[in-house]
Swiss-Prot record:
Monomer. Residues 126-163 are annotated as: LID. Consists of three domains, a large central CORE domain and two small peripheral domains, NMPbind and LID, which undergo movements during catalysis. The LID domain closes over the site of phosphoryl transfer upon ATP binding. Assembling and dissambling the active center during each catalytic cycle provides an effective means to prevent ATP hydrolysis. Some bacteria have evolved a zinc-coordinating structure that stabilizes the LID domain. AMP binds at residues 31, 36, 57-59, 85-88, 92, 160, 171. Its EC number is 2.7.4.3. GO terms for biological process: AMP salvage. It comes from the Bacteria. This is Adenylate kinase. GO terms for cellular component: cytoplasm.
Length: 214
């Protein structure tokens, strides 16, 4: 089974990807993991990605597509895979379709996790992290034992600039603008299913499996 997971920041698609990977026995492939893998291996792609990120630029479609092509050449994807964070644009989706066709394959389903904006704002703006050890907390869902301080090293917790409510709303708007054409692309092909992304991870997994006929 080949699945594509879509959803705004804070929709929980990364959590669902991990649960589905375990449930279906197929690898979870995320763009972030691919970037880190290439950087760790010191590949030419990894060096290009690092140079772009150091300059504050955006990784091009060509580089991202090349990473996906390399990843899909590995034997562990034979039974299927779950893509998280790719494709992000119609251009990438068209490339992926062509790549899969060349391999005699096609996607089974694109899943779009739908979450109300205010819930996304609450999920993300409640995050707090430790600047010393990197531990991540949430003010209501996973609070530290002592409010505002890390359990591990007692450092004062901070809120990332990106996680402030006004910036989360801005990211949601950007996501909607960029992703709507992609959702339309898969919807027009009869490959898109909307999934209610509200509830416990286990509950959302149950809904996802029902959508997939599992």
């Amino acid at each position: 089974m080949i699945l594509i997971l879509l959803g705004p920041p804070g929709a929980g698609k990364g959590t669902q990807a991990k649960l589905l990977s375990s449930e279906l026995g197929i690898p979870h492939i995320s763009t972030g993991d691919m970037f880190r893998d290439h950087k760790a291996r010191g590949t030419e792609i990894g060096k290009q990605v690092q140079a772009i990120m150091d300059a504050g630029g955006l990784v091009t479609d060509d580089i991202t597509n090349a990473m996906v092509k390399e990843r899909l050449s590995r034997p562990d994807v034979a039974p299927g895979f779950i893509l998280d964070g790719y494709p992000r644009t119609v251009v990438q989706a068209e490339y992926l379709d062509g790549l899969l066709r060349s391999l005699g394959r096609s996607i089974d389903r694109a899943l779009s996790y739908e979450v109300p904006e205010e819930l996304v704002v609450e999920r993300i703006s409640g995050r707090r992290s430790c600047p010393r050890c990197g531990a991540v907390y949430h003010v209501s869902q996973n609070p530290p034992h002592r409010a505002g301080f890390c359990d591990r090293d007692d450092a004062a917790l901070v809120q990332r600039e990106d996680d402030k409510p006004e910036n989360v709303r801005k990211r949601m708007q950007e996501y909607g603008t960029k992703t709507e054409p992609l959702k339309r692309y898969y919807r027009d092909r009869g490959e898109l299913s909307d999934v209610e992304g509200v509830g416990t991870p286990e509950g959302i997994l149950a809904v996802t499996k029902k959508v997939l006929g599992r």
